Amino acid sequence: MESVMSKYENQILIFPDYLEEFPDTDELVWILGKQHPLKTEKSKLLSDISARLWFTYRRKFSPIGGTGPSSDAGWGCMLRCGQMMLAQALICRHLGRDWNWERQKEQPKEYQRILQCFLDRKDCCYSIHQMAQMGVGEGKSIGEWFGPNTVAQVIKKLALFDEWNSLAVYVSMDNTVVIEDIKKMCCVLPVGAADPAGDFLTASNQSRDTSVPCSAWKPLLLIVPLRLGINQINPVYVEAFKECFKMPQSLGALGGKPNNAYYFIGFLGDELIFLDPHTTQTFVDIEESGLVDDQTFHCLQSPQRMSILNLDPSVALGFFCKEEKDFDNWCSLVQKEILKENLRMFELVQKHPSHWPPFVPPAKPEVTTTGAEFIESTEQLEDFELEEDFEILSVG
């Protein structure tokens, strides 16, 4: 196994570069809902990009499942992209979209805690170990390549065990986002009005008017898996796809090419800007100080770009809505920019479709242990239902 991984690593390290240096142009660059005039704000643009957490292949971590691979080189790229999208959601949740990372500067304690959620250890809630093991419940063997929809389902299930970040993760189905279902999942009611610091219960079983604001809102990670063509992206979707990167709720997109995943964070013209996980670095652990050396978790090189028409049509868009007003604003933007198209990229509907099974907000299954440590073996995944993976990535 190790010799095979070494072969992969050598191939990956000499991966041909895409477009890197930004051209001399007056065009705007959009990065995760923020615009940067390229000519006047290039340094600010590069700083914004390097502030994103960058997760790549790693080697020399403890074997997954005790006897599995100790490197994810060659198969873990979509998992790493999923980690990057989720990490951006957590940054927005705790530090805000405008927070910026500065090299070798002391960072907020929330930043370190977020980073430690993704370390390559079985006891970290969003580690490669946890994601790969949870993928078994989605029909993926450990060491098998994941598609965007599978990663979205894995994130949704792992988030149930993450009490600190307390995210509601909604993964759309059949290219349709249902407002009523999201409000049921995210609106929470206090247990006893006299105790504002008390625990909260979801209002999922209550019939409520979704036009009435919630008393409290569980931060929402919204993932929309899409297929934007058969063997290649249909040009009719290009403008709507780009509009999603302009939305202030944007977490970018998961996608790429068959068996080569990238985390897309913005665009310039008709070129997508992405972070590339195809670099193999050595496992980094928590130091004696209790902190993590974060120098290898930020990409300090100029980001890569590719033509949007070269994108494989199987993608997943991500959005983060910290408060209910953010979600309501997102709905308005979708109605204005996405639903106006003759061939819509996805649908946004108010009510749960009558021909669908009833919506049941995801709940943590009953297990004997709690937190990330619960997935010690694939036998413990039987409480989760298998989600149908609709994506059919083109080959060749």
Swiss-Prot record:
Q: Does the keyword Hydrolase apply?
A: yes
E.C. code = 3.4.22.-
Catalytic residue list: C77 (nucleophile), D276, H278
Disulfide partners: none
Q: Where in the cell is it found?
A: Cytoplasm
Activity control summary: Inhibited by N-ethylmaleimide. Redox-regulated during autophagy since reducing conditions activate ATG4A whereas an oxidizing environment such as the presence of H(2)O(2) inhibits its activity.
**Zinc found in the keyword field:** no
Q: Name one GO biological process term.
A: lipid metabolic process
Q: Which protein is depicted?
A: Cysteine protease ATG4A
